[in-house]
Amino acid sequence: MNVIEGVVATPNARVAIAIARFNNFINDSLLDGAIDALKRIGQVSDDNITVVWVPGAYELPLVANVLAKTNRYDAVIALGTVIRGGTAHFEYVAGEASSGLSSVAMNSDIPVAFGVLTTESIEQAIERAGTKAGNKGAEAALTALEMINVIKAIKG
């Protein structure tokens, strides 16, 4: 039986982080967590990390697609926060961000890690950005690194 598993230590990985400015008081913590995980656990150097700011979560798939098509990155990490409000806007933005990022991953053959919080409240978002529920930015970074290695192992 063959078993393929990825590791997170990936010193030569080239990683792009696409991050939404909207709700940046939360997203800044996601970014800090992602960069810390890339550098401390993944051993990725500053020179191999590119951060691209976009207006909001809805814009993440387009930028992730452009980044993936450059062939300069081994993975893209998408970070953002969508908080439910009193209108259907939440469903549209969260749904399009999720399906768009998934589509980029499927069509580009590079990992696109989903670090977009979709929460019911600001409190839930804060918890997932580094307090009670860990840091989802760091988790997305580790997912990206592991997937880089899984795909490399599959391709041989």
UniProtKB/Swiss-Prot annotation:
Function: Catalyzes the formation of 6,7-dimethyl-8-ribityllumazine by condensation of 5-amino-6-(D-ribitylamino)uracil with 3,4-dihydroxy-2-butanone 4-phosphate. This is the penultimate step in the biosynthesis of riboflavin.
InterPro entries (alphabetical): LS, LS/RS, LS/RS_sf
Encoding gene (name): ribH
Binding site for 5-amino-6-(D-ribitylamino)uracil: F22, A57, Y58, E59, T81, V82, I83, F114
NCBIfam families: lumazine-synth, PRK00061.1-4
Binding site for (2S)-2-hydroxy-3-oxobutyl phosphate: G86, T87, R128
Assigned keywords, A-Z: Riboflavin biosynthesis, Transferase
Gene3D superfamilies, alphabetized: Lumazine/riboflavin synthase
BP terms from Gene Ontology: riboflavin biosynthetic process
E.C. numbers: 2.5.1.78
Keyword Transferase applies: yes
Origin species: Yersinia pestis
Superkingdom: Bacteria
GO molecular function: 6,7-dimethyl-8-ribityllumazine synthase activity
Subunit structure: Forms an icosahedral capsid composed of 60 subunits, arranged as a dodecamer of pentamers.
Active site positions, chain numbering: H89
Recorded catalytic activity of this chain's protein: (2S)-2-hydroxy-3-oxobutyl phosphate + 5-amino-6-(D-ribitylamino)uracil = 6,7-dimethyl-8-(1-D-ribityl)lumazine + phosphate + 2 H2O + H(+)
Coiled coil: none
EC category: transferase
Protein family membership: Belongs to the DMRL synthase family.
GO CC, alphabetical: cytoplasm; cytosol; riboflavin synthase complex
Pfam family, one: DMRL_synthase
Name of the protein in question: 6,7-dimethyl-8-ribityllumazine synthase
Pathway the protein acts in: Cofactor biosynthesis; riboflavin biosynthesis; riboflavin from 2-hydroxy-3-oxobutyl phosphate and 5-amino-6-(D-ribitylamino)uracil: step 1/2
Keyword Transferase attached: yes
